[in-house]
Amino acid sequence: MNLSPREKDKLLISMAAMVARRRLERGVRLNHPEAIAIISDFIVEGARDGRTVAELMQAGAEVLTREQCMDGIAEMIHDIQVEATFPDGTKLVTVHQPIR
């Protein structure tokens, strides 16, 4: 299987998000990379499902709460930007203050 660098990045984010979800299920608080991965994966999959950029910008800030992350993680992540493939092309989705 020959994957492009972009496809490899998407696969890595998806795998990291799967690990993060399992940790959440066990009650483990997420670290920085896990929080980024789970929100990024939510955006990529939402775009694939046909949601709009505006919907994902709003919903992306509701994926995780401060209580689900280690202390200080919410303050470390000011914005998350993800290039996602929508039915009408690739667009940049920015989520401001993604962990509230």
UniProtKB/Swiss-Prot annotation:
<dbReference type="InterPro" id="IPR050069">
    <property type="entry name" value="Urease_subunit"/>
</dbReference>
<dbReference type="InterPro" id="IPR012010">
    <property type="entry name" value="Urease_gamma"/>
</dbReference>
<dbReference type="InterPro" id="IPR036463">
    <property type="entry name" value="Urease_gamma_sf"/>
</dbReference>
<comment type="subunit">
    <text>Heterotrimer of UreA (gamma), UreB (beta) and UreC (alpha) subunits. Three heterotrimers associate to form the active enzyme.</text>
</comment>
<keyword id="KW-0963">Cytoplasm</keyword>
<dbReference type="GO" id="GO:0016151">
    <property type="term" value="F:nickel cation binding"/>
</dbReference>
<dbReference type="GO" id="GO:0043419">
    <property type="term" value="P:urea catabolic process"/>
</dbReference>
<comment type="similarity">
    <text>Belongs to the urease gamma subunit family.</text>
</comment>
<dbReference type="InterPro" id="IPR002026">
    <property type="entry name" value="Urease_gamma/gamma-beta_su"/>
</dbReference>
<dbReference type="GO" id="GO:0005737">
    <property type="term" value="C:cytoplasm"/>
</dbReference>
<dbReference type="GO" id="GO:0009039">
    <property type="term" value="F:urease activity"/>
</dbReference>
<keyword id="KW-0378">Hydrolase</keyword>
<comment type="pathway">
    <text>Nitrogen metabolism; urea degradation; CO(2) and NH(3) from urea (urease route): step 1/1.</text>
</comment>
<protein>
    <recommendedName>
        <fullName>Urease subunit gamma</fullName>
        <ecNumber>3.5.1.5</ecNumber>
    </recommendedName>
</protein>
<dbReference type="Pfam" id="PF00547">
    <property type="entry name" value="Urease_gamma"/>
</dbReference>
